[in-house]
Amino acid sequence: RDRHVAEPDGAPSRLAAPERWPESERLEDWAMGAAMRRGRDIVASHAVVGEAAAASRLGAFVSGKIADYKAARDLPDEDGTSSLSENLTTGEIGPRTCWHAGLRARDEGKAGAETFLKELVWREFAYHLMHHTPRLVTGNWREEWDAFPWREDRRLAEVRAWERGRTGIPFVDA
């Protein structure tokens, strides 16, 4: 709270090409079945990518859904998140841009802005931890927790029901 976060830098005026481009694979060489190729067409209508799309998504969020963000973000049947995760992950928008948009929304009295800012800080904190402690990606914070005595008996009725999507809890079984 009350920490200074620098304004986002503008786009660089020039980017140098790498000395050697990385190897790449052609999707056609993956020998995927027809069902997988069909999936591409289904996903394409939902994948809105690029910096302009990310900026538009952020603008729509802070002018609308941010007001209910505190409660709606936790409800799976509500469209209550910022939907910016993929844009942040791919670098189409930066956390500083989101931070300053959140600050402006908070200053305008939008109810969910403070929660949005906190969630953004938690996201960046988690990435910071993973960068400086890479084992967290596949292990526990404390290594002794790796020996936790989980109930792994596959004969348990609960495990079998979960594996088959038959727990009786619609959200879990979906």
Named regions from a protein language model:
Residues 139-151, 157-163:
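Conserved oxyanion/phosphate-binding beta-strand-loop segments in alpha/beta enzyme cores
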